[in-house]
Amino acid sequence: MKIPPICCVITQLPQAETLKKSEGAAFYELRLDLLGENWRETAVLLNKPFMATCRRSAEGGSFKGNEAERINRLEKAASAGAFMLDIEYSTPNLEEVLGRLRPQAKCLLSHHNFTDTPSAAKLKTLLKDMLTHQADIYKVITTATSINDNINLLNLTKEIPDKKIVAFAMGEPGILSRILCPLAGSPFTYASLNDGNKSASGQMTLAQMIEIYRSVNYANHT
């Protein structure tokens, strides 16, 4: 059965049995800020590639160290096998950080808006600003306050067709864009390993996402 690539988010040390149920994932995202020192043990358990993310509190995470420590943790993740690193657009000295990390792993440049979803024009301007920095994938995530907000995010991926752009909205009203973003051009979408691993509002479990794609016969729509 064909389904879109799904990045399965892991926020706590998983049981081996739980990982066996995640075969439908294309790869994992390890939340280094939430896993703490357990991230290394978790990485060893994985049977698929993984991306590493280490969020500051301002970006919805829990990392309490300084920036040097945060970047160092991402470097350690790359050394441990992470094929991609999520770097926030708000990162201080962004160009320097990207220059330091890109030789070690692919970089996904991300922006998160935890308040609302800006207009289509503002999102386009934001994306163009992000594209002035060299990255492998660009991610724009907002918070939906209405169903209509999904449209702005789904259309955003079409603005620069030659770039890889992940765009969807958080929150219950944004679930639609989480499901449909691969059909709109996003290279992948996100899901949690299970209910205990959810890292954002509106995030569905991997099993739920797979069941939805199976129900609508996703392969016939691509």
Swiss-Prot record:
Q: What EC number(s) would the UniProt record show?
A: 4.2.1.10
Q: Which reaction does it catalyse?
A: 3-dehydroquinate = 3-dehydroshikimate + H2O
Q: Name one GO biological process term.
A: amino acid biosynthetic process
User: What Pfam families does the record tag this protein with?
Assistant: DHquinase_I
Instruction: List the InterPro entries.
Output: Aldolase_TIM, DHquinase_I, Type-I_3-dehydroquinase
The job of this chain, per UniProt, is described as:
Involved in the third step of the chorismate pathway, which leads to the biosynthesis of aromatic amino acids. Catalyzes the cis-dehydration of 3-dehydroquinate (DHQ) and introduces the first double bond of the aromatic ring to yield 3-dehydroshikimate.
SUBUNIT field: Homodimer.
Q: What is this protein called?
A: 3-dehydroquinate dehydratase
